[in-house]
Swiss-Prot record:
This is Small ribosomal subunit protein uS8. One of its GO terms (biological process) is translation. The gene is rpsH. It comes from Marinobacter nauticus (strain ATCC 700491 / DSM 11845 / VT8). Part of the 30S ribosomal subunit. Contacts proteins S5 and S12. Pfam families: Ribosomal_S8.
């Protein structure tokens, strides 16, 4: 049986690994997952990530903790396969009053809500991170 929502699986694996205080988490890789991992790294939510060069590439994300607590308090999928959420540049949500980020897939690539607003582009709201 094939997986329907691979990004939701990615976020669940990250949540579960952090609750178990794991140093890193491994999952099957895809271009979208690597793009999301890059945004999470750029925003300081994860320490690092790497992609293996196997026949079936795997994405390994090194999680980040501060004072023994996970840096990511909450990561939630917004747009899902059965209900896509598209927003214009002016309609992009501010997460936790601007303290968190929304990750958006735009025509210019995957970026944060702040970067999308600054570029004046909207897109599919993939998830929110706080």
């Amino acid at each position: 049986m094939s997986m329907q929502d691979t990004l939701a699986d990615m976020f669940t694996r990250i949540r579960n690994a952090q609750m178990a205080s794991k140093a890193d988490v491994t999952m099957p890789s895809s271009k979208m997952k690597v793009s999301v991992a890059q945004v999470l790294k750029d925003e300081g939510y994860v320490a690092d990530f790497s992609v293996s060069a196997d026949a079936k590439p795997e994405l390994t994300i090194t999680l980040k903790y501060f004072g023994g607590k996970p840096v990511i308090e909450e990561i939630q999928r917004v747009s899902r396969p059965s209900l896509r959420q598209y927003k214009g540049a002016g309609e992009l949500p501010k997460v936790a009053g601007g303290l968190g980020v929304a990750i958006v897939s735009t025509s210019r690539g995957v970026m944060t809500d702040r970067a999308a607003r600054a570029a004046g582009v909207g897109g599919e709201v993939i998830c929110t991170v706080f």
